[in-house]
């Protein structure tokens, strides 16, 4: 985990270069949207809280949350890591708190940008769910808050000052429509013309944790390591030159339609795709690679301006 944190903090420039050179740049900036919320008054007690003790008891914290009346979340697709059930469970347990779901397909970077754009308004995200690369380089945007189970979280899985902590993980994998493309044994298979315009990372490597780690998977299989990201860059350049790489954002819709027929993504997402597509008569397969077991936690953080 320490090594991954160092990698995340030190290699964004290289991965950004990959995004522009291999995937092509996109001039659209989602953070440029004008502020749409109403100005709100900050609750000083809540803003200064660094742990449950500052509220009193859990009942006191719940009462404060119910008084506010709403929770703004972002980048929580219902089929991602079972977030749909988590959200429904929260609603049942705390019916007095309205959940406002924003941009479920936002990248980690777009989450933080939304907090900046909507700062001081009721449209700002209250909490973030972030890949390590963005979490570890964006701590100035987070509140220092240590959750109730803080002491049980390993030191290597949290920020020492309480800016963020890891909560769930998966293994990076490659998934594909086996009915259409047959078997895939290696990443070199994806250079075949039959995969024209259909191979996708789940997001942009410089912005999204899934895409960043998809890049690391390819880099590892291409002979690279934590200190050498060039082989991955070379691989994706070849994939682009072959006409097989697409920069379309991966969603249920693009997978259902076949627009993204091969996807680098976490195993828990692939399992969700497989289940949904099976109901539609599509055989979606996915695999991990023994020589490239890329694992990275996602992290929870609180918007310091929430």
Regions found by a protein language model. Give the residues of each.
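Sec-dependent bacterial lipoprotein signal peptides
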Residues: 1-21
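Short, polar/charged alpha-helical segment
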Residues: 55-66, 76-98
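Short amphipathic alpha-helical segments
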Residues: 69-71, 172, 296-300
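Bacterial lipoprotein signal-peptidase II cleavage site
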Residues: 6, 19-36
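N-terminal low-complexity, Pro/Thr/Ser-rich intrinsically disordered segments
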Residues: 33-68
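Extracytoplasmic/periplasmic substrate-recognition and gating elements
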Residues: 277-306
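A ligand-binding cleft/hinge motif common to bilobed small-molecule-binding domains
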Residues: 134-139, 256, 262-282
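Extracytoplasmic ligand-binding site segments that recognize negatively charged/polar headgroups
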Residues: 72-88, 100-116, 122-259
């Amino acid at each position: 985990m320490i090594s991954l944190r160092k990698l995340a903090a030190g290699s964004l420039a290289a991965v950004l270069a990959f995004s522009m050179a291999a995937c092509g740049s996109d001039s659209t900036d989602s953070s440029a949207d004008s502020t749409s919320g109403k100005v709100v008054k900050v609750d000083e007690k809540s803003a200064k809280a660094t742990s449950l003790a500052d509220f009193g008891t859990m009942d006191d914290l719940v009462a404060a949350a119910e008084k506010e009346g709403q929770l703004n979340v972002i980048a929580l697709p219902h089929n991602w890591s079972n977030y749909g059930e988590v959200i429904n469970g929260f609603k049942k347990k705390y019916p007095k708190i309205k959940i406002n779901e924003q941009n479920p397909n936002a990248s980690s970077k777009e989450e933080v940008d939304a907090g900046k754009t909507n700062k001081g308004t009721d449209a700002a995200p209250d909490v973030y769910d972030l890949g390590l690369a963005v979490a570890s380089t964006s701590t100035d945007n987070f509140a220092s808050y240590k959750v109730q189970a803080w002491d049980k979280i390993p030191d290597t899985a949290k920020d020492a000052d309480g800016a963020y902590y890891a909560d769930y993980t998966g293994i990076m994998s490659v998934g594909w429509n086996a009915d259409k493309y047959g078997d895939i044994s290696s990443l070199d298979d994806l250079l075949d013309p039959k995969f024209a315009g259909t191979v996708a990372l789940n997001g942009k490597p410089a912005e999204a944790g899934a895409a960043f780690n998809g890049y690391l998977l390819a880099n590892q299989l291409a002979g690279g390591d934590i200190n050498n990201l060039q082989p991955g860059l070379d691989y994706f350049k070849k994939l682009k030159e072959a006409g097989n790489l697409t920069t379309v954002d991966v969603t249920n819709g693009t997978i259902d339609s076949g627009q993204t027929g091969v996807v680098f993504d976490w195993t828990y997402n692939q399992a969700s795709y497989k289940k949904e597509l099976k109901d539609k008569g599509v055989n979606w397969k996915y695999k991990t690679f023994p020589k490239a077991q890329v694992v990275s936690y996602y992290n929870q953080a609180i918007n310091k301006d929430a």
